[in-house]
Swiss-Prot record:
Disulfide bond positions: C58-C147
CDD domains linked to this entry: Cu-Zn_Superoxide_Dismutase
Taxonomic path: Eukaryota, Fungi, Dikarya, Ascomycota, Pezizomycotina
Name of this protein: Superoxide dismutase [Cu-Zn]
Region (Disordered): 125-144
Enzyme class: oxidoreductase
Localization terms from the record: Cytoplasm
Protein residues bound to Zn(2+): H64, H72, H81, D84
Binding site for substrate: R144
Length: 154
């Protein structure tokens, strides 16, 4: 079992953690989140981005992690970036707790997300389904108010 965590920080009141657990190289990864301080009663995007570089805030993380050269999509789509995690829902206080399993997110192997950045976005991911020019690249998910590098956890 490999475990990892991203501790979220940024230029906003958003904070929290996103954890990852993978039993072996062929197993799906469980992604769990506990996020506070976002917009109330909203769907907000989160993605794994290419770089673990946060020297200029979350913008330094680069584009979505996309080792297979696919278009942006929903987590359940065949054609999607590895880093496309979709949206999480916040409650009336702007907090979100949840988990999902993902077959493309890996902690083991050449396409591992370890050392990359988990980014929380200001907007909702359109899952690559709109006519907006950013839809097939970013899901038109907006600014990056919080992020954290994915590191190995105890």
């Amino acid at each position: 079992m490999v475990k990892a965590v991203a501790v979220l920080r940024g230029d906003s009141k958003i904070s929290g953690t996103v954890t990852f657990e993978q039993a072996d190289a062929n197993a799906p990864t469980t992604v769990s989140w506990n996020i506070t301080g976002h917009d109330a009663n909203a769907e907000r995007a989160f993605h794994v981005h290419q770089f673990g570089d946060n020297t200029n805030g979350c913008t330094s993380a680069g584009p979505h992690f996309n080792p297979f050269g696919k278009e942006h999509g929903a987590p359940e789509d065949e054609n999607r970036h590895v880093g496309d995690l979709g949206n999480f829902k916040t409650d009336a206080e702007g907090n979100a707790v949840g988990s999902k399993q993902d077959k493309l997110i890996k902690l083991i192997g050449a396409e591992s997300v370890l050392g990359r950045t988990l980014v929380i976005h200001a907007g909702t991911d359109d899952l690559g389904r709109s006519e907006h020019p950013e839809s097939k690249k970013t899901g038109n998910a907006g600014a990056r108010p919080a992020c954290g590098v994915i590191g190995i956890a105890a």
